[in-house]
Amino acid sequence: MPLFAVMAAAAFSLPAQPPAATGANLTVAMDDARIVLLGQIDTTDARRPRLGYPGTGMILRLEGGALSLRLSSTTDTSALTVVIDHGAPALKMLRKGEQTLVLASGLDPGPHVAEVYKRTETWKGVVTLTSIELSAGGSLLSPVSLPARKLLFVGDSVTCGAGVDNNPKCNEEPAHPISDSYHSFGMDLGRRLDAQTHLVCYGGRGLDRDYRGLGVAEGVLNAPQLIDLSIPSDDPGSRATWDYRRWTPDAIVVSLGTNDFNLEGIRPLSEEKFVTDYAHFLKSLRAEYPGAFILTTEGAIVTDPRLRRYVQEAVAQTADARIAWVPAEHYPGNGCNAHPDAPQHLHMADDLEPVLRRVLGW
């Protein structure tokens, strides 16, 4: 398996800064070129990158017995996933405010690889990375080389991995959130296909309206607006924009419509508007990424045949041979949460893997 088949998202190497000694340990600023940042991440302040979308994070190589991460969280509901030396992913819950998170301890001299991914959605909190701390005698090694292949997944809470860790109690325990981006179908596909992976997703949002029926007119952002951001927020003062030139996907998988259809029995969608807006969104993706293959699907939750038809009509309206529709299987969660759970996310990846391999020649 390729060295970085376990990872996802994009990398941005930044100018190296000399590390500063702190007592017996070594502190390294986040703009050190040996720290590779992952995902649609906000680097407005290169020394304090911010993680909004799930799956954003960092990867680095080191020698030394211990590694810590200095960070701050806007809430006490954010969580990270930490992977050391391609081992089992570990859950790290965060508290609100500044903190030092031990990523690894008791390691042999190495070398080692450490990966950190934002586990939870943006609305659960934004995480700012401040610095890396290595134990005495430790050092960072040359930056990792990421896979050349790149995948972008655009969607809602399912794309984010909400429900992956559904538990038998049918509740979300504060110490163990049910969201897990690392085991989402998109991130899993990235590992299978040896590709960097971006997740641009937000729970409860759709193409034109969210699960409450709200859209831009009510100050609520949906996918066509979220795609432009690295920190998505309905509050204009809290947003950060994304520069499309920083990363170009080979393929884009769009899974939208579940939340648009949430109020279908009360406030039916206009088929004409939904189809036209969807086609316009697909064309806007094409304009930003001329070489990407774009796959659309209706998602794993809604079984209404109208949604499937609307998506197909939108694809046809683009008249683009490299924009296609693939049917979604229904994955109903575990009985107490409608979101697909971990085994079902694996099945979703199973469904899409042969399609992506075929259209991309991978």
Identify the role of each PLM range.
Residues 253-257, 282-287, 293-296, 305:
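Conserved, well-ordered alpha-helix/loop/beta-strand core segments that scaffold catalytic motifs
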Residues 274, 278, 345:
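Aromatic/hydrophobic pocket-lining residues that form the small-molecule binding cavity
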Residues 299-362:
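Catalytic His-Asp segment of secreted/periplasmic serine-dependent ester chemistry enzymes
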Residues 278-282, 311-312:
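Generic structural signal for well-ordered alpha-helices
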